[in-house]
Design a protein with these regions (language model features):
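Cytoplasmic juxtamembrane interface segments
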Residues: 2-18, 76-85, 154, 179, ...
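Juxtamembrane/transmembrane-helix boundary motifs in multi-pass membrane proteins
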Residues: 19, 57-60, 84-89, 93, ...
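Alpha-helical transmembrane segments
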Residues: 24-38, 97-101, 166-168, 219-225
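Membrane-interface loops
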Residues: 46-47, 84-171
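N-terminal transmembrane-helix/juxtamembrane module of multi-pass inner/ER membrane proteins
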Residues: 1-75, 107-133, 263-271
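Alpha-helical transmembrane spans of integral membrane proteins, capturing the lipid-embedded, hydrophobic core
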Residues: 29, 94, 98-106, 186, ...
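Loop-to-helix transition at the N-terminal end of transmembrane alpha-helices
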Residues: 54-69, 95-98, 185, 242-248
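Membrane-embedded catalytic cores of phosphoryl/pyrophosphoryl-handling enzymes
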Residues: 128-267
Length: 271
């Protein structure tokens, strides 16, 4: 069994090849730019919205709510913290990505103050709470692609990279299906999140703290996520979202408590 500092050192050294990462990452970025250019045409933007929104009307509401909730800050935060329990050396990069994402989305939404589909269209399929302003860019999509970008840059397995990317795409499309955003909002949000992940991972080093300290930080962040969700208790009328979030948060806290106790015990001297 390797000591704690050795485990941290090995985890830090083992990274994928930069050239392979950059080429695949930039390929995804190119596809996102093409999608964004297409949505700049007003007619294409409207027709694409109508198609996906009508498709959403034929799908179960609970399914769309669960998928779209994966891009919510609380739910996404809980999910990425679960990932951090397995890859704690990603800690600094995830924190910086999250902060950049929150700041950029807030600023752009306030600056553009673009109307949402519900404020423009008379006939629309809305699932969840109707919103009318601050459409551009999609915060859920930006969050989903930012966290997917971090995992894409840092994970070793191709199936893991593709899985998180497909989840991020599903979150973006679900925002159209529930009537919350235009395709243009989704495409730009995806580009923004993807670029922020690249910026954070390129500028911020991997964590070199002892594993037990990393896990205690993750535990503290888990408590922040829990308190944030409790503050919203009773405000969201959709029970499926509450069940979805509490299930994820319960798994997160259980896992972080286990990992904290595990590495706390491993640091105790043997008698």
């Amino acid at each position: 069994m390797l000591p704690t500092h050795e485990l941290s050192r090995v985890a830090t050294v083992k990274q994928p090849q930069d050239s392979e990462i950059n080429s695949s990452f930039l390929s995804v970025l190119l596809l996102l730019f093409i999608c964004h250019i297409l949505t700049l045409n007003a007619q294409t933007n409207l027709e694409t919205f109508n198609w996906f929104n009508e498709l959403g009307a034929s799908l179960p509401s609970w399914l769309l709510l669960c998928v779209t909730d994966l891009g919510d800050g609380i739910t996404a935060g809980a999910l990425i913290l679960i990932c951090l329990t397995y890859k704690p050396q990603w800690l600094y990069r995830v924190i910086v990505t999250t902060l950049l994402c929150a700041l950029c989305v807030h600023f752009l939404k306030q600056y553009f103050d673009a109307p949402r589909p519900a404020a423009v269209l008379e006939v629309i399929n809305i699932i969840g709470k109707a919103r009318y302003e601050h459409a551009f860019p999609s915060g859920h999509t930006t969050t989903a692609f930012a966290l997917a970008g971090v995992i894409w840059l840092l994970a070793d397995k191709l199936w893991c990279k593709l899985s998180v990317l497909m989840l991020a795409v599903a979150v973006g499309l679900s925002r159209i299906a529930v009537g919350a955003h235009w395709p243009e909002d989704i495409a730009f949000g995806a580009i923004l999140g993807w670029l922020l992940a690249y910026l954070a991972c390129g500028a911020v080093p991997l964590s070199t703290l002892k594993l037990k300290y990393q896990y205690w930080i993750i535990f503290a962040l888990s408590m922040i996520v829990l308190v944030s969700e409790l503050k919203h208790l009773g405000k969201d009328p959709f029970s499926v979202l509450l069940f979805n979030r509490y299930l994820i948060i319960t798994a997160l806290i259980s896992l972080t408590v286990y990992m904290c106790s595990k590495f706390q015990l491993s640091d105790k001297p043997h008698k």
